[in-house]
Amino acid sequence: MKYPTRLSDAVHILAFIALYPDCDLTSNKLAESVQTNPAYVRQLMSALRKGELLISVKGHPRPALAREPEKITLLDVYRAVEG
């Protein structure tokens, strides 16, 4: 049985951004880390932006967390990507 991976992939993306705040993180680079395609990463990042967990600007490869990592809960991420 295949399980949805949106939540774990979103957590992976947020953690990667938190660990490398000063690096250029394109959707291609994030997709390589998550082992998926860039379009899927962009969809997740859009959901995370709408959920006010991520700040990013199209064409600017340095996304940032909208809050301190300690203040982002799994429930916040779940609501953003599955809500």
Where is each model-derived feature located?
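Conserved segment of winged-helix/HTH DNA-binding domains
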Residues: 69-83
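A short alpha-helical element within helix-turn-helix/winged-helix DNA-binding domains
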Residues: 28-35
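Alpha-helical residues within the helix-turn-helix
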Residues: 32, 49-50
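Short alpha-helical segments that sit at the start of domains
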Residues: 1-13
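Beta-hairpin "wing" of winged helix-turn-helix
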Residues: 51-66
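Short helix-capping/hinge SLiMs at alpha-helix to coil transitions
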Residues: 18-22, 67-68
